[in-house]
Amino acid sequence: RDWNPDVLIVRYWMSYFAPSLGYITRKMKKHCKVISILDNVIPHEPHFFDAPLTRYFLKGSTGSVTLCEAVSKDLLNLQKDARYTVIQHPLYSHFGPKKDRFETEEKIGLKHGMKNILFFGLIRTYKGLDILLEAFGMLPDDYQLIVAGEPYGSFDKYQEIIDRIPGKDRIHLNLKYIKDSEVSDWFSTADLAVLPYRSATQSGISSVSYHFEVPMIVTDVGGLKETIGDRGTGIVAPEGTPECISSEIQRYFSD
């Protein structure tokens, strides 16, 4: 109230924040409009308490902005009279320009002249890295896979797959948090970004891919299909299986 704002904008993506943010927004709603930007309404890895906590938070909002239709659907399931608008996830522009591919391959330690597949970002179960690893094992020898991101928990189950599939010597792992200043290096090496997600709303990774003009293969879950749409910027895999992902990767390079 000391700020005396006309509008308070709050970003929300997981129920962990609902008690604290909901308390603030309910107080502030008495004095100004409260707009919630909803990355997710229900987390990718849900818990029994998500719905009641999110309802508590939403009651403090005057209106909401969702980043895809999938989130809008989740919102209406919890709050049938919700006031909202859909604005797709914006592009990121703070990662700098695309760099020379040869130089970034040298910097990272990649073999030149290969078809580079990129899996980028936090490694969580719902993001389907295991599916991509199995798919990669079916690809010819002129492909290499780049995995750049921090594991959310143990990497053991992924390492077990890597150890048994063909082509493990063509998998480059960088299992750590990627600084903003380093993001350009990874996308500048990529021919194709693959998002083999088991569930999704929208994805910030797709926005980074757009910024660096890297085509994508995504699974048909959540709002990922909306991201690709009819723009000719990638392929929506009809099935989230290793066989389908492998086939779509090869189709991309053959078309």
Positions of the model-derived regions?
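Acidic anion/phosphate-binding donor-loop and adjacent secondary structure
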Residues: 47-48, 76-77, 90-108, 113-114, ...
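Conserved donor-binding/catalytic core segment of Leloir-type glycosyltransferases
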Residues: 110-127, 133-137, 146
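Glycosyltransferase donor-sugar binding loop
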Residues: 120, 144-159, 176
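Nucleotide-activated donor-binding/catalytic signature segment of Leloir-type glycosyltransferases, i.e.
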Residues: 158-184
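Acidic donor-binding loop of glycosyltransferase active sites
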Residues: 185-202, 211-214
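Conserved acidic donor-binding segment of nucleotide-sugar-dependent glycosyltransferases
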Residues: 230-242, 249-255
